[in-house]
Amino acid sequence: FNKFGKARLYYEALSFEEQDEIYAYTKRNVLPTLTQMNLKYAISAKNRARTVAGVSILSTMTGRMFHQKCLKSIAATRGVPVVIGTTKFYGGWDDMLRRLIKDVDSPVLMGWDYPKCDRAMPNILRIVSSLVLARKHDSCCSHTDRFYRLANECAQVLSEIVMCGGCYYVKPGGTSSGDATTAFANSVFNICQAVSANVCSLMACNGHKIEDLSIRELQKRLYSNVYRADHVDPAFVSEYYEFLNKHFSMMILSDDGVVCYNSEFASKGYIANISAFQQVLYYQNNVFMSEAKCWVETDIEKGPHEF
């Protein structure tokens, strides 16, 4: 594939009908592909080598055709937590920060870093990201179509064959950095970890010591929805989302994020702080996040340290 140059050539060489045929084929068959690991060549302050995974053009083409509507709508929407596609120029950065700290009482900024994010990501969470990105296809695709698309995605970017240094290996999992949906899937993963940390924090609170009755009620309903319920209650999901949006405002770009949270609530344990994230990463991501990778900024005027 690499003998002929760039991907543009394939898009020009294949007619739209042929591209559609390949796409339709992936809804009833699995196309296993090869991924090539390359050393990244960049000027960097850090003294370390990074690798990028280049996935096959077939995987990229069909994957983009499947996810395009969802990805385009994420990239085109302004004023939402995931800021992929938002410009930082023309006052965009100022706009994002103002939206982040809006309506949060006693605000504090914090950020963190996922160590070895794309290598340590659990396979089930990468699959969940695929499912979340494909959730809008319930009207146009049958269950079989969607299952085959998921199987394709797993065979192409989750546990595919990797060519590295002239040898072939089976990748045990993790996310491929050259996949068409990498940034979006990482954003879903980021939200998943943040919500997990918040759920754990609120569940770990002593219910008898919560003075705020609305939060005590929220904790009780959260408990029954997590441990007792046999179906998802959309009303409660949106209510908890509103609670997090108000007291734990996030700005997300792939695996990077800034949070503006209510420091009073965090000190009482109603929402997550850095230590809650450390715990979640330790048992849900199998990595230890050191304090040096995190930052907390109590002075809102200074803005985030790094994003």
From Swiss-Prot:
User: Positions of the region RdRp Fingers C-ter?
Assistant: 116-174
- The region called RdRp Fingers N-ter is annotated at 1-76
* Start and end residues of each Nsp12 RNA-dependent RNA polymerase domain: 1-307
At the top of the EC hierarchy, this enzyme's class is transferase
Region: RdRp Thumb; residue ranges are 307
Catalytic residues, chain numbering: S254, D255, D256
Recorded catalytic activity of this chain's protein: RNA(n) + a ribonucleoside 5'-triphosphate = RNA(n+1) + diphosphate
Domain (RdRp catalytic): give its ranges: 107-269
Known role: The replicase polyprotein of coronaviruses is a multifunctional protein: it contains the activities necessary for the transcription of negative stranded RNA, leader RNA, subgenomic mRNAs and progeny virion RNA as well as proteinases responsible for the cleavage of the polyprotein into functional products. Non-structural protein 1: binds to the 40S ribosomal subunit and inhibits host translation. The nsp1-40S ribosome complex further induces an endonucleolytic cleavage near the 5'UTR of host mRNAs, targeting them for degradation. By suppressing host gene expression, nsp1 facilitates efficient viral gene expression in infected cells and evasion from host immune response.
What's the protein here called?
Replicase polyprotein 1ab
Enzyme Commission code(s) on record: 2.7.7.48
Region entry RdRp Palm N-ter, spans: 77-115
Q: Which residues form the signal peptide?
A: none
Question: Which SUPFAM superfamilies does the record match to this protein?
Answer: DNA/RNA polymerases (SSF56672)
What family name appears in the similarity comment?
A: Belongs to the coronaviruses polyprotein 1ab family.
Q: Write out the ranges of the annotated region (RdRp Palm C-ter).
A: 175-307
Q: Which gene encodes it?
A: rep
Q: Which GO terms describe its molecular function?
A: nucleotide binding; RNA binding; RNA-directed RNA polymerase activity
* InterPro entries cross-referenced by the UniProt entry: DNA/RNA_pol_sf, RdRp_CoV, RNA-dir_pol_C, RNA-dir_pol_PSvirus
Keywords tagged on the record: Decay of host mRNAs by virus, Eukaryotic host gene expression shutoff by virus, Eukaryotic host translation shutoff by virus, Host gene expression shutoff by virus, Host mRNA suppression by virus, Host-virus interaction, Nucleotide-binding, Nucleotidyltransferase, RNA-binding, RNA-directed RNA polymerase, Transferase, Viral RNA replication
